[in-house]
C-alpha cells in the first residue's frame, strides 16, 4: 500500500541556502555597509562587523536582530532584490532538482526561519523555487515608500517555530524537519524524522547527543525519504546517514 506523503519543514539559512560564509541577513548587512547611499563611518563599520561576527558564532542573537533592524532602516527594497539575486546563485542545480522533484512527488513543504522571510522568499523566487513551498514564514520587514522602516518579529526565537507547528496541528510522526543548527533544535527534537545538514562535516560531533540523521548535501535526503516511506517512520528504523 502506498504511504501518505509527509510534510517537510525546512530551515532556510544554512539549510536551503549554503552559508559560505554568511547567511542572508549577514549578507544584506555587509552589502549595505559597503554600498549604502550614505557611507558607514569607521565606528559604524566596526560595530557592524562585530555583530556579524557574533551572529556567525551564534552569540548575542537578540542584540544582532535589534542592531540589524536599526542599521537597515532606510534601505530601498531594490537593494534587497540585488542581494537576493546574488544569493540565489548559491543554491546548486542539484539542490534545485531535489526541491522540484519533492514538489512533483506531492510533498507539502514549508520554510520556517528565525531569519528574515523577505530574504527567504526573494532568494527562492530568483532561484525558481518559491512555488515549491506552501508557506515561507519568518520575521518580516516593514516598509514605507519602499524603504525599510522596521521589522515584524513573527518567529524571533527557535521555540516559536515549534509553537507554529503545533498551531498547524501537524504530527511529529508525519513531519520531517530539516535544519542546520541551534535555532532548529526545538523542531528537530520534536520531529520523528529530524535531519541535520552538515556540509562542513563538523556538526556531527557537536550534535552527537541528539538522535538526528546527518546529511552533507541536499541530494542525500532522497535516501532518507525512501527509507522513511518503507518503514514505520521511527528513528530506530531509519538509519542515520553519515
Residues covered by each model-derived region:
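Substrate-recognition element of Asp-dependent hydrolases with the DxDx(T/V) motif
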Residues: 98-127, 133-139
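Short acidic-hydrophobic, aromatic-tinged amphipathic segments that line or gate anion-handling sites
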Residues: 211-221
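Short loop-to-alpha-helix "cap/lid" segments that border enzyme active sites
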Residues: 153-170
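Asp-based phosphoryl-transfer active-site loop
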Residues: 4-22, 188
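Histidine/lysine/aspartate-rich catalytic loop segments that bind and position anionic ligands
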Residues: 129-155
Amino acid at each position: 500500500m502506498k504511504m501518505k506523503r509527509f510534510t517537510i519543514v525546512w530551515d532556510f539559512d544554512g539549510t536551503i541556502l549554503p552559508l559560505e560564509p554568511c547567511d542572508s541577513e549577514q549578507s544584506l548587512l555587509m552589502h549595505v555597509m559597503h554600498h549604502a547611499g550614505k557611507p558607514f563611518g569607521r565606528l559604524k563599520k566596526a560595530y557592524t562587523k562585530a555583530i556579524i561576527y557574533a551572529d556567525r558564532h551564534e552569540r548575542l542573537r537578540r542584540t544582532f536582530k535589534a542592531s540589524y533592524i536599526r542599521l537597515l532602516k532606510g534601505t530601498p527594497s531594490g537593494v534587497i532584490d540585488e542581494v537576493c539575486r546574488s544569493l540565489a546563485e548559491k543554491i546548486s542545480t542539484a539542490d534545485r532538482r531535489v526541491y522540484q522533484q519533492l514538489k512533483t512527488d506531492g510533498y507539502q513543504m514549508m520554510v520556517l526561519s528565525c531569519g528574515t522571510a523577505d530574504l527567504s522568499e526573494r532568494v527562492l523566487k530568483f532561484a525558481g523555487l518559491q512555488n515549491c513551498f506552501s508557506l515561507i514564514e519568518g520575521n518580516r520587514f516593514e516598509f514605507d515608500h519602499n524603504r525599510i522602516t522596521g521589522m515584524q518579529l513573527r518567529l524571533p526565537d527557535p521555540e516559536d517555530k515549534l509553537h507554529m507547528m503545533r498551531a498547524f496541528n501537524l504530527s511529529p510522526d508525519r513531519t520531517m524537519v530539516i535544519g542546520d543548527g541551534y535555532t532548529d533544535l526545538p523542531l528537530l527534537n520534536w520531529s520523528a524524522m529530524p535531519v541535520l545538514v552538515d556540509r562542513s562535516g563538523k556538526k556531527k560531533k557537536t550534535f552527537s547527543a541528539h538522535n538526528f540523521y546527518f546529511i552533507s548535501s541536499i541530494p542525500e535526503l532522497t535516501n532518507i525519504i525512501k527509507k522513511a516511506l518503507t518503514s514505520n517512520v521511527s528513528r530506530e528504523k531509519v538509519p542515520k546517514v553519515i
